[in-house]
Curated annotation (Swiss-Prot):
Stated name of the protein: Heme A synthase
Transmembrane segments: 9-29, 90-110, 120-140, 156-176, 197-217, 255-275, 283-303, 309-329
A single GO cellular-component term on record: plasma membrane
Gene: ctaA
GO molecular-function terms, A-Z: metal ion binding; oxidoreductase activity, acting on NAD(P)H, heme protein as acceptor
Binding-site positions, heme: 259, 313
Main location: membrane
EC number: 1.17.99.9
Source organism per UniProt: Wolbachia sp. subsp. Brugia malayi (strain TRS)
Catalytic activity: Fe(II)-heme o + 2 A + H2O = Fe(II)-heme a + 2 AH2
Function field: Catalyzes the conversion of heme O to heme A by two successive hydroxylations of the methyl group at C8. The first hydroxylation forms heme I, the second hydroxylation results in an unstable dihydroxymethyl group, which spontaneously dehydrates, resulting in the formyl group of heme A.
Biological processes annotated in GO: heme A biosynthetic process
Bilayer topology term: Multi-pass membrane protein
Pathway assigned to this chain's UniProt record: Porphyrin-containing compound metabolism; heme A biosynthesis; heme A from heme O: step 1/1
Alphabetically ordered keywords of this record: Cell membrane, Heme biosynthesis, Iron, Membrane, Metal-binding, Oxidoreductase, Transmembrane, Transmembrane helix
Length: 335
């Protein structure tokens, strides 16, 4: 009976984790379609319904026409063009609401029925808190783009993505806790191996941060060659901003260079990890995920950011991180 209850909780956590990955994809599509600023208000309840008639559409369009983005980039756009942008952002927000409901309602049920332990309730409550923070961050990010300069800060974009990653990590690791069983094995797992995987996971998080910087700064639109950057291993314009440290965060060439370098470093470290733990199947999933993610990144760069591949690259970063969490959970179970 207890195993069946754990299975139902695990299925729920898996569904929530998948929905977060899908949300990341929808968010990426919204950004690349330049639709994120088309809805100028945040109404958590009434906003769940789209404009239902022509009068409502005219009202929404008139609100958008007061924004700097409309005046600067979309002046004179047709109603059909506006509807397309609006519906993309609407689906983004609707899916966020749906994800929240699919998490909250079963969470209340499982808690009241004592299907989950107090420790798990605390962990999932933390995830819920981050979900609320994520909603406010998303709106603040949109609001920041409705001012004189119609551009969303790449720092806000990164924070928005990182909060999604934190929620994904909390839910998926708890899912792995339910699914990964302790096995009788002759494999000796040392504490150093666990720490080594932890370092790789930290590097993946840093890599996701710089991936968000690349996206927010449009750094993928320069140096569309691989492995060289403008014919050089190290491009010449890495440190032209002053003070020098600012290049790490705001120089497009530097941000892309760091993103490339981290990808290769993670590949090398994961390859070493695989060689040292060759008898563990889950480590091969992690290595394969790294290879697929690098291929997606290189293709995205070479083809000048095609939307489908770029979104796949963004979504797969979470799957890569999840594969690392799964292997970490396995190691801790064996310990």
């Amino acid at each position: 009976m207890e195993q069946k209850q754990s299975k139902s909780v695990a299925i729920w956590l898996f569904l929530c984790s998948i929905m977060i990955v899908l949300m990341v994809g929808i968010g990426g599509f919204t950004r690349l379609s330049k639709a994120g600023l088309s809805i100028t208000e945040w109404n958590p309840i009434t906003g769940a319904f789209p404009p239902l008639n022509e009068r409502d559409w005219l009202q929404e369009k008139s609100k958008y026409e007061t924004t700097p983005e409309y005046k600067t980039f979309n002046y004179g756009m047709s109603m059909e063009e506006f509807r397309t942008l609006y519906l993309i952002e609407y689906v983004h927000r609707l899916f966020a609401r749906l994800t929240g409901l699919i998490f909250i309602l079963p969470f209340i049920y499982f808690t009241l029925k004592k299907r989950i332990s107090k420790k798990v309730v605390i962990r999932l409550s933390i995830a819920l808190s981050f979900g609320v923070l994520q909603a406010f961050t998303g709106w603040y990010m949109v609001k920041s783009g409705l001012v004189a300069k119609p551009h969303v800060s790449h720092y806000m974009l990164t924070l928005h993505l990182l909060l999604a990653l934190v929620i994904f990590a909390l839910l998926s690791y708890q899912f792995f806790n339910y699914q990964v069983r302790q096995k009788q094995t002759k494999l000796k797992i040392s504490g150093s191996t666990v720490h080594y995987v932890g370092i790789i996971l930290i590097l993946i998080v840093v890599q996701i941060i710089f991936g968000a910087f690349v996206a927010g700064l449009n750094a993928g639109l320069i140096y569309n060659t691989f492995p060289l950057m403008g014919g050089h291993i190290i491009p010449k314009d890495l440190f032209f901003l002053q003070p020098t440290w600012l290049n790490i965060f705001e120089n497009r060439a530097t941000v892309q260079f760091i993103h490339r370098t981290l990808a290769l470093l993670i590949l090398v470290l994961t390859t070493v990890l695989t060689i040292k733990n060759a008898s563990v199947k889950s480590v091969y999933v992690m290595l394969l995920s790294v290879i697929i993610q690098i291929i997606l990144g290189v293709v995205t760069l070479l083809l000048h950011i095609p939307i489908t591949i770029a979104i796949s690259h963004q979504m797969f970063s979470f799957i890569l991180f999840g594969s690392g969490l799964c292997f970490l959970c396995y190691l801790r179970k064996q310990n």
